[in-house]
Amino acid sequence: MAVEPQKSHRPGPLKQQNKAHKHGKHKSKGQLERETKGRVNVKVLSKKNRQSMKKAERRNQALQMRKQKRDEVLEKKRNRGGTNTPPHFVVVVSLDRNIDTKVLLDLLKVADDSAVVKQNEQGILHLSIPRFKQRVSIFTPEYGNLYALLDAAKVADTLLCAVSTDNVIDKYGEHCLSCLYGQGMPAAVFVCNGFKSLPMKKQAETRKLMQRKIEKRFPAEKFHSLDTSQDALLVVRQLTNQKLRNIQYRDLRPHVIGEEISFELDNTESDTGTLKVTGYLRGKTLSVNRLVHIPGWGDFQMLQIDAPDDPYPLNLHPGKQHRKNQDVEMESEDPHSDVRVLERCDPGQQESLDSEVLPDPMMGEQTWPTEEELAEAESESRKKIVKRVPKGTSDYQAAWIIDSDEEEGGDSEEESDEEMDADMEAQEEDDSSEEDLNDDDDKTEYETVTIAEDDASKYDAAMDLDEDMQMLAKLKEEKQHVQFPDEVDTPANVTARSRFARYRGLKSFRTSPWDPKENLPSDYARIFQFENFKRTKKRCVEEDMDEGAMPGWYVTVHVANVPKAFIEGYQPGSPVVLFGLLPHEHKVSIVHFVVKKCADVEQPIRSKDRLIFHVGYRRFSANPIFSQHTLGSKHKFERFMPTGTAVVATVYAPILFPPSPVLVFQETAYGEQSLVATGTLLSVNPDRIVAKRAVLSGYPFKINKRSAVIRYMFFNREDISWFKPVELRTKWGRRGHIKEPLGTHGHMKCVFDGKMKSQDTVLMNLYKRMYPKWTYNPHVTTPTVVKEYGTGNMDSDDKAEEGAAFQMFQ
């Protein structure tokens, strides 16, 4: 019997097809090897090498990095307090008004029996301690003199912060610490006098209270008792041996704090003279052909640099004394004098004080006026206005009388939208009162009074408005801005196309193009701009000077053309600090700062308000404009400095190379200056676009499926046709455009991407570029000394009114 063949199952046409595994279509290892053909990626190769380091090699690398950091710290310590290095500069900060700094200084004087103690006319105490092989200079600014403290802290190596056993740190002490933190805090040591005189039970409680308050700002610091000479010796050792902090804006530039100050007038009738500042040079090398800056007074040139003998040497034996200055060639003006001239200025190589560009009128695209037109404009500006006024009328009263023949001038381009709207309302009231004035002309006897056009400025200078009412108006305006941001009412008596002639519509604020070089103001022809700012900064910072005074030398700097008002307002005990400028740092450009409003500041700060800036080593006043701190090419203008978020302040100012800390102060009516914001330098960029937004609003009159009739946005047919290309949006998220005008009273038909709600509002966004005003002023007056912080000069009634004004809007 034959064996039957084995049958196997054969799939039919209806076989189930399972889906293939979705592996993401990644290439296999073999496919990648075939494509690369043995080549290895550079990143992978370096990564393998890093991972293949042996344990001993990694340990050796860590030890080398640790040794390098330790050597850097030791090198900084060796650069202070030695024989050929400047003394360790210490600033005593009284954090409570009841602290007697004289007791602290007396204890430091007797810290070491072998120490040599000297004190100069500027109030700087010098201690030469052979035991530690260190020199220490101690300066104590007056309590309440904030500028003296900030200027001294700019060049300080260490702050000796004195706290009390009662309040530890008072309100003014907290204010000083906030300013010092914003400016750049050097190393700090906390001491307390009178701690050991407390009962033993109270010492533990007081110690906990002090440590808790200190740890809020300085978590790693502890306070030291300073009651005996032994305590003082430990404090001096702590001052000279602790790690120093880096403050880059100071360490990158040469700086001198005045040990001796003298002033010589150029001649008896001159308003300027030569200021001689003698002190230890710190930081970098100082060249006489560079410029120096005096905080609060501006930039100056130098005539020469002298090298007198060091009056506070560490080695007191004349035979063993070695002058580092003798390594260079110097000439002496007098053979019997110890003063040697290090360097004299070379007029051919000396840096110029020109901070602005002289614009060429023929280089601009606009037509420049002729000399006849300029002369005519000047005569028009000086022209007197003759009015008929009643007899006995003063100049002040005559300025308020409206002349029927006087033409109503247009609003200035620099005025804000709110000011222009207020002017339009006031104009209507003036027109109604003008008729009543003309009716009484025949009944009143008149005389002719000549009034200059600048009477308004005279009136403003003599005006003394109530500060509480100003604050109330600002609070109202800020609240309205928060509730209805950037919304502007369209004027009914002025065409919108002329009212918003400088504005433009943007399809997208983020992506729409905007040329930063178009329609620039005339002030932009006076400023400087770098092709590559970062590269210029790197070149200026890394530049080494072969000639000049070296850090650590005791020098006398002759500063030329210093105003006589400087020495007239100078008070002994206030520090005089000189900072050498890097190349290009005296040239004016557009400077941007990122600042944040202080949490305890309640009053609104409007854009274009006068503020006082402390930027690194500079101090000046300006009227900044605020804008949002965002990414992109365009940044929205802010009418007020917001609370809780960072904002960019833009001003015309001399160029500064970052990093530089920023302190912003606002002057009060009583001459005090309050800290309102802190921040840092952002950039120097004239091409940064700050766009102001104006939002026109309209309301639906009739609503269809996708179209609606909108009114109250415009009031004539021509304005609707003019703004027809601009996109519309609503508060509820609809988008649309103008289709056609209806009638002659401002109604228009608009089409949207969906049906509108009856309670919705139609908005149109318009933008114009904003520029800061040229209000830079390097001369800043020193504020009054605060005897008790936070009291001011207000009466109790004024305080009650101010509190009521704030409560209305909280």
How should these model regions be labeled?
Residues 107-111, 178-179, 213:
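A generic secondary-structure signal
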Residues 98-100, 165-170, 195-199:
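Short acidic, S/G/P-rich loop/turn micro-motifs used as interaction or catalytic elements
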Residues 112, 163, 214, 218, ...:
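Conserved NTP-handling cores and scaffolds of large molecular machines
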Residues 100, 104, 145, 152-155, ...:
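Alpha-helical interaction elements in eukaryotic regulators
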